[in-house]
């Protein structure tokens, strides 16, 4: 199943981005076949990362000064959706690692030079949860901590690590510290039930000096005073963090729903139900009702998720501000997209029969991966709905992720 809306090619960058999407389409059969290998390895196979690099996926949100396309973010997320439909872990890691090129573009030029100066294909992993801190020292910060859940960390040579800035024993700022691989270790601890192939291991840092230019405050991102905006002026870099980050988490999950749907329909088309006197599943009217309901919810999840991103980007291209109402709607629909996707996968999985429990059955893998993705903080529906509800009554948002 493919989404009901096609991708428009509005400019030369979009045409190039479309060629990246075409390249992704060519890779999908291989990525699907490697899904079990990714789980066994507990990280994405090296060949897959190399192939994504080759087709230009990681260039989609990278600044043009580094050979990137700095394209319409809906095209990036469309690529993520397609990858997630082939392998949940691959969609997850590609989304997170891919969006980091957008994040790095907001850092001071000196930081970008240090990461990409010798090789613009260098990748950055992350763990934004505040599991460590940076103490103010002369010229920068002394950082220590142990950051869990750094997806794709084995394929990166730098890391964004989130946490507070401490001065005189008190937090005075909050943001991301950018640290090279030579100054942190990775603890291999990723033994999990879902998203097994993401290699979301723990990054450990002890008393590492981080210069000022390699720290970016979330406040600077939100009020558009980030140093990187002086050199990277494309509209995509003005997108709100509160839209970009949560969408990065939801897009692969909706992709998993598309993958689960396709796997379910293919399976049902061949399935004979022994419990019902050899009835062919495709002749069961109730089976058709279930797939129709699932298809509708999955399409609507994607339409709303990507539609809000497109609406925000269209305003930025016109030089206009994004109203808070739209940002609140984007968060509302982002968590709703995750919920719709997972409930659709549940509906399909429950109707797939006992053979769906086999390790080589794609439906069970998508089911596990989607539920694993749901536990990410960006998918907590109550907080996002509260932002929207408060705004409807003229009350403050009480949350920063918007």
List where the protein language model places each region.
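Basic/polar N-terminal segments that are highly enriched at the extreme N-terminus
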Residues: 1-26, 398-402
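C-terminal helix-coil-helix/basic helical segment that borders enzyme active sites and/or dimer interfaces
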Residues: 32, 36-39, 299-336, 346-357
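Glycine-rich flavin
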Residues: 44-54, 58-156, 170-172
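Buried hydrophobic positions in well-ordered alpha/beta secondary-structure cores of metabolic enzymes
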Residues: 79, 143-145, 205, 257, ...
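DPxDG-like acidic metal-binding loop motif
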Residues: 146-184, 188-189
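Glycine-rich beta->alpha junctions and the first turn(s) of the following alpha-helix
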Residues: 200-298
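Generic structural signal for well-ordered, non-transmembrane alpha-helical segments
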Residues: 255, 292, 296-299, 331, ...
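Glycine-rich phosphate/cofactor-binding loops in nucleotide/flavin-utilizing enzymes
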Residues: 352-402
